[in-house]
């Protein structure tokens, strides 16, 4: 039955899709599919810290989107998804540096830390962020992602094993 404004309620419904959350899940699942043979996936884990204050400490936590711990224990990969067109904004770099500098209780001595800020893009491409102690890269990843040669696993393996002075990949 047709609706007439003001006399009959309009028959419709709506829903909201949080594309940033959807992209975060997509990135996690895609990286897990590529890395699962050699890495354990940790997602949604809080890492607590304290702000020491007279009269009582303030408890807070940081939560990286995704962590991939190498089965052999020699690397820890932190992946944070950013659903935005502008890559490498200062607040995103600060956030990743907090994740990389956190004193992870399960971190082994000598374990290499790598940070990947992942953005939607037209092609799989890696852009190094220089000037910091830890290896940090901005990554653009197409939606949908289809494995290419070299694939995501091979590229991440290469980046986690080589020195920071590497040639651009992709």
Language-model segments: which ranges?
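Catalytic core segments in nucleotide and nucleic-acid processing enzymes
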Residues: 7-170
């Amino acid at each position: 039955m047709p609706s007439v404004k003001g006399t009959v309620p309009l028959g419709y419904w709506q829903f909201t899709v949080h594309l940033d959350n959807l992209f975060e899940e997509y990135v996690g699942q895609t990286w897990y599919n590529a890395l699962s043979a050699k890495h354990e996936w940790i997602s949604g884990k809080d890492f607590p810290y304290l702000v020491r204050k007279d009269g009582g400490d303030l408890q807070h936590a940081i939560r990286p989107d995704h962590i991939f711990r190498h089965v052999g224990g020699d690397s820890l990969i932190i992946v944070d998804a950013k659903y935005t067109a502008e890559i490498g904004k200062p607040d995103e770099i600060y956030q990743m540096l907090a994740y990389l500098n956190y004193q992870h209780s399960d971190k082994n001595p000598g374990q290499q830390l790598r940070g990947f800020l992942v953005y939607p893009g037209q092609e799989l491409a890696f852009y190094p962020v220089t000037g910091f102690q830890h290896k940090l890269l901005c990554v653009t990843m197409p939606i949908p992602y289809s494995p290419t040669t070299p694939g995501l696993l091979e590229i991440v393996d290469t980046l986690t094993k080589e020195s920071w002075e590497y040639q651009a990949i992709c």
